[in-house]
C-alpha cells in the first residue's frame, strides 16, 4: 500500500550551558551545509528531484529506464535507487500512435493528474503508469515530451517502440517496474481495455499459498504457421500444433517472486517468440509458477464482478478503443457499480 510519510523530529539539546560562540559557530555550519546541499541539488544531475511531486514521499512518476542493447546485463535504471512500496504496479503498454487512447483512459478510469494518481494509489494500493519506448522521429519525441510535461504519468523505456519488438518491450517493462517499485504483483495491461482498479486490487490481494503466481484469462489455441497472418509464429516448429496454456495479452500479472527471477537473468538468455503473450507463457512453463485463470479479466461487457472489459474475441482489446472507452464509462454498470457485487446479484 501507500508508504506512510516519514517524519523526522530533531531532539532539543539537554545541555543548558552553551557558549554564545559555540551556538554561533554551529548555526553557521548548519547554514553552510544547507547552502551546499541546495547548490548540489541544482548543479549535480544525480541529485536533482524530477517530476511534479518532489515534495511528497512518492517517486517521480516519469522516469527513464536504460535498456542494455548488448544483452549482457539485466538492465539499469537511471534515477532514484530506492524502490517505492506498493501492493501492485500496473504498467499500461502504449505507443506513439496511441495519444488518443491515452486521452480516453484519462477521461475514464485512469486519473489525469498526479494528485488523482496518488489518491488512487492510497485507496487501492495500485500505482499506474504508461510504459513507452523511444523512436527516431524527433517530432514524435517532442510530442511525447509535451504530454509528459502536462501529465507526468510515464515510464520511458530505452528500447525502440516497434510492434515486432513487443516481447523485448515486455521484458524491459518488468525489469524497469521491479527496479522502481517494491510490489507484490506487476500487472501488464494494454491501453485499449476498460479497467476497474478497485476490483483488480481485490484480486491481487487474495491470500495465496504459492508465492510464484501467473494470473490472467488463460487460453490455448492453434499455432499460426501462415506468414500472411498477423499472429504468425516463425518458431512454430518448436511449439507443435497447439499453444500451451497462457494468458491473453491485454492484461495479466506476475507476482514479485516471478519477476525477481526474470530480473536476475541476462537479457540475451530469453527465448523470444513472435507474440508477446506466448513469450511470457513459455517463460512461465520453465518456472515453478501457479497458473490462475480469471475470466473476470476478459469480459466483453461490464458486469458486477468484471475487472477488465474488452471486445473478446473480435479484437485483442476494445474495438475502436478511443470511442468505446468513453461509451463504457457512461454506463453505470461500468463506472458506478460497487466494487463488490451485492447479495442480490
From Swiss-Prot:
Glycans are attached at residue 267. Pathway: Protein modification; protein glycosylation. Its EC number is 2.4.1.-. It is a single-pass type II membrane protein. Its main location: Golgi. Disulfide bonds: none annotated. Gene3D superfamilies: 3.90.550.50. GO terms for biological process: protein glycosylation. Keywords: Glycoprotein, Glycosyltransferase, Golgi apparatus, Manganese, Membrane, Signal-anchor, Transferase, Transmembrane, Transmembrane helix. Its cofactor is Mn(2+). One of its GO terms (cellular component) is Golgi membrane. Pfam families: Galactosyl_T. GO terms for molecular function: hexosyltransferase activity. It is found in: Golgi apparatus membrane. The chain crosses the membrane at residues 24-44. Beta-1,3-galactosyltransferase that transfers galactose from UDP-galactose to substrates with a terminal glycosyl residue. Belongs to the glycosyltransferase 31 family. This is Probable beta-1,3-galactosyltransferase 14. It comes from Arabidopsis thaliana (Mouse-ear cress).
Amino acid at each position: 500500500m501507500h508508504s506512510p510519510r516519514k517524519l523526522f523530529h530533531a531532539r532539543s539539546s539537554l545541555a543548558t550551558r552553551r557558549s554564545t560562540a559555540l551556538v554561533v559557530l554551529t548555526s553557521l555550519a548548519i547554514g553552510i551545509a544547507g547552502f551546499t546541499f541546495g547548490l548540489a541539488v541544482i548543479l549535480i544531475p544525480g541529485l536533482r528531484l524530477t517530476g511534479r511531486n518532489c515534495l511528497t514521499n512518492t517517486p517521480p512518476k516519469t522516469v527513464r529506464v536504460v535498456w542494455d542493447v548488448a544483452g549482457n546485463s539485466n538492465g539499469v535504471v537511471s534515477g532514484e535507487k530506492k524502490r517505492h512500496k506498493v501492493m501492485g504496479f500496473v504498467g499500461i503498454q502504449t505507443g506513439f500512435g496511441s495519444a488518443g487512447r491515452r486521452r480516453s483512459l484519462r477521461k475514464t478510469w485512469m486519473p489525469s493528474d498526479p494528485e488523482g494518481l496518488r489518491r488512487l494509489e492510497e485507496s487501492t494500493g495500485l500505482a499506474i503508469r504508461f510504459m513507452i519506448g523511444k523512436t527516431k522521429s524527433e517530432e514524435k519525441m517532442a510530442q511525447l515530451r509535451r504530454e509528459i510535461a502536462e501529465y507526468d504519468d510515464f515510464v520511458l523505456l530505452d528500447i525502440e517502440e516497434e510492434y515486432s519488438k513487443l516481447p523485448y518491450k515486455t521484458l524491459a517493462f518488468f525489469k524497469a517496474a521491479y527496479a522502481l517499485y517494491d510490489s507484490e504483483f506487476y500487472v501488464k495491461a494494454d491501453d485499449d481495455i476498460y479497467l476497474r482498479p478497485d476490483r483488480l486490487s481485490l484480486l491481487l490481494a487474495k491470500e495465496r499459498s504459492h508465492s510464484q503466481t501467473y494470473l490472467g484469462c488463460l487460453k490455448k489455441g492453434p499455432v499460426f504457421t501462415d506468414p500472411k497472418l498477423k499472429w504468425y509464429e516463425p518458431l512454430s516448429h518448436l511449439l507443435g500444433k497447439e499453444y500451451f496454456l497462457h494468458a491473453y495479452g491485454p492484461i495479466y500479472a506476475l507476482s514479485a517472486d516471478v519477476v525477481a527471477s526474470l530480473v536476475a537473468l541476462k537479457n540475451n538468455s530469453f527465448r523470444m517468440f513472435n507474440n508477446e503473450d506466448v513469450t511470457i507463457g513459455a517463460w512461465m512453463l520453465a518456472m515453478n509458477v501457479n497458473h490462475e485463470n480469471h475470466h473476470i479479466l476478459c469480459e466483453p461487457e461490464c458486469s458486477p464482478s468484471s475487472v477488465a472489459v474488452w471486445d473478446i474475441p473480435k479484437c485483442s482489446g476494445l474495438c475502436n478503443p478511443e470511442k468505446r472507452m468513453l461509451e463504457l464509462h457512461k454506463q453505470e454498470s461500468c463506472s458506478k457499480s460497487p466494487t463488490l457485487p451485492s447479495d442480490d446479484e
